[in-house]
Amino acid sequence: MNGMGERDELLMLAVRDGDVAKLGLLFDRHHRVLFDYFARMTGDRAAAEDLVQDVFFRMLKYRKTYRDDSRFTAWMFHIARNARIDHHKKRRGEVMFPEEGMEVPSRSPFPNQELEQQQETGLLQRALFKLSEEKREVLVLSRYQEMKYEQIAELLGCEVGTVKVRVHRAIRELREVFFKLSGEKASWNAKKSETSLRII
């Protein structure tokens, strides 16, 4: 069996038990998700690429810690968070700003609308990086990674209610920062942009 139809958990159990080639299948499935997480948390594409590689290196190194009842995605993101925290410690004191081109390209067939959406997405990324790391992370996990509150609570080691409160506060602050950067009032029409709607 080539492993293409196997669940992540079964693949990781195979890696743990010595079939390390299966890690390549897990990489193919999850490297984009991890890159998106790291890119939005660090604002640095090169660092995001390095961190993705680091996660899979750590998976291989610590494969024996993977338990029979572990959920692969939760285990993977625990490793990813540790890798990001270590990276942050090394770069402590540096001011992070999202790189040019970090925005998700628009698919709008209308040039003016596309430009407007790109500008709003850029503002949204700038606003995101003005939040604390804790608030930025809960937004990245809940909105970009589309993780359920229960999954985030498990990852962060807190109650589901705590996650809901953190997300609510983070969205409120992000909205305030976004409006401040854009110079628009809080009465801004939410239907104006699907791009911004995804977060605020």
Region annotations inferred by a language model:
Residues N2, R16-L25, F35-D54, V160:
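Short, charged helix-capping/linker segments at alpha-helix termini
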Residues I85, K135, Y144, E150, ...:
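DNA-recognition helix of helix-turn-helix
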Residues L13, D17-V20, R92, R107-V140, ...:
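Amphipathic alpha-helical segment used for protein-protein interaction
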Residues M1-V33, R126-F129, A190-I200:
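N-terminal module of bacterial RNA polymerase sigma factors
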Residues M4-D8, E94-Q117, K191-R198:
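Internal acidic/polar
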Residues F27-R45, Y62, L128, V177-K180:
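Amphipathic, Lys/Arg- and hydrophobic-enriched alpha-helical face
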Residues D36, D50-F57, S70-N82:
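Structural recognition of an alpha-helix C-terminal capping motif at a helix-to-coil junction
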Residues K61-D68, H78-P98, P109, Q117:
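Arg/Lys-rich amphipathic alpha helix in sigma70-family domain 2
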